[in-house]
Curated annotation (Swiss-Prot):
Bilayer topology annotation: Lipid-anchor
Cellular compartment(s): Cell outer membrane
Mutagenesis or variant effect for residue 15 to S: Loss of activity and destabilization of the protein; no T-pilus formation; no loss of virB7-virB9 complex formation
Annotated GO CC locations: cell outer membrane
Name of the protein in its database record: Outer membrane lipoprotein virB7
Keywords, sorted A to Z: Cell outer membrane, Crown gall tumor, Disulfide bond, Lipoprotein, Membrane, Palmitate, Plasmid, Signal, Virulence
Positions of N-palmitoyl cysteine lipidation: 15
Lipid attachment locations (S-diacylglycerol cysteine): 15
Main location: membrane
Amino acid sequence: MKYCLLCLVVALSGCQTNDTIASCKGPIFPLNVGRWQPTPSDLQLRNSGGRYDGA
C-alpha cells in the first residue's frame, strides 16, 4: 500500500510542473542551407543502399 501511495504521489507531482513545452524555431536543417546540390549519381536508386530489383 505504501508503494502504491508513493507511486501516486510521484505521478501527480509530475503533473504540477509549470515548465513550458519545448518548441523549435527556424529551419529544420539550419546548417548549409541552400549549399548542397545533388549530383545525378546521388539520385540513382542503386546508390541508395536498399533492395532494388529494377522492376
